[in-house]
Amino acid sequence: MKEELLKRFTKYVKVDTQSNEESTVCPTTPGQMELANILVTELKEIGMQEVTVDEFGYVMATLPSNTTKEVPVIGFLAHLDTATDLTGKNVQPQVHENYDGKDIVLNKDLNVVLSPKQFPELADYKGKTLITTDGTTLLGADDKAGITEIMVAMNYLINHPEIKHGKIRVAFTPDEEIGRGPERFDVEAFGAKYAYTMDGGPLGELEYESFNAAGAKITFNGNSVHPGTAKNKMVNAVKMAMEFNARIPKDEAPEYTEGYEGFYHLISLNGDVEQAKAYYIIRDFDHLKFVERKTHIASIAKELEEKYGEGSVELKLNDQYYNMREKIEPVKEIVDIVSAAMRNLDIEPKISPIRGGTDGAQLSYKGLPTPNIFGGGENFHGKFEYVALESMVKATEVIIEVARLFEEKE
């Protein structure tokens, strides 16, 4: 299993599937369709049935039931795209066997070092096989580890018919990282009663609570005048953006929050005297606090527009997804069965809120309750991203065990 996981994973991460928020097509980048087509071929090769990919890059496939019992159809999902934070082009995965617990030099020329001093959780991986970047790209374990684990689990079940299971559906979706994954996902065609995203982090993670999420695009329209004659005429759009940001609580940012604490996050700011554009994301687990945060953003925009004149501040505020706890708690047994599967494999479940979102958050509101299971990766979205091969083995085994337990309990 280890060899197959390593072979598939290192193949998938070399396909550049970074999504693009500025694109209006789906998938937003051609690399996602490239990987989708690769997976379609491989799904057919391992013996999956009803393998399809639509024009938008959504891959679906079926592993038929091999039991006479009436077992609910379950699904496993992972996303094709990688994050926009750092390039996913020319990913060169590095394999470090029997990790010694010390610094890993990812890139000598650029002096990029993965160090337990900065990332103390590395101590947990001593003796394991780590797959890292070369220090110039992200790795793409988010979520190609999940894709790999689903592929290997399905292949294992096909080759081990003695493990009884109901009908299993798998899906690989585009554009999750920019919040569009479920937009064109056909829940009815997928046909599962429950599903799981393999999109979590370290070993044991199990999540059924997510942020409420919104995005705020703000355009500041200034007035550029020659600085020599600018008195009482110039309006500096960049300074307007700075003034806007100064009114947001400094301690309510990602770098100062944890657990159930929400935040405002300035993703990007660019511009000049004439015009500046800022993009914020707004996150909170509590719905009332979420609404308050959006109201605060809107009130700052209104106050600045009143100060600088009509049309000086343009705000586009949109909800992205909601806390899926509300939809999963009524069927909490689907979380409990994963906990049982983990314990059967000597994994202690670590149930915590997702300080982020998965396709499952939106799918749960479309009628498909979808908790999130660990994929094994650490430090997602950056050059220090890595995954332990042994964690990928465990995630694969969890998929297999969940399928077995659903059949056993009927």
From Swiss-Prot:
SUPFAM superfamilies: Bacterial exopeptidase dimerisation domain, Zn-dependent exopeptidases. The keyword Transferase does not apply. The active site is at D81, E176 (proton acceptor). Keywords: Aminopeptidase, Cytoplasm, Hydrolase, Metal-binding, Metalloprotease, Protease, Zinc. Pfam families: M20_dimer, Peptidase_M20. It catalyses: Release of the N-terminal residue from a tripeptide. Signal peptide: none annotated. Its EC number is 3.4.11.4. Coiled coil: none annotated. Its cofactor is Zn(2+). Zn(2+) 1 binds at H79, D142, D199. GO terms for cellular component: cytosol. It comes from the Bacteria. CDD domains: M20_peptT. Binds 2 Zn(2+) ions per subunit. HAMAP family: Aminopeptidase_M20 (MF_00550). Belongs to the peptidase M20B family. Cleaves the N-terminal amino acid of tripeptides. This is Peptidase T. It comes from Listeria monocytogenes serotype 4a (strain HCC23).
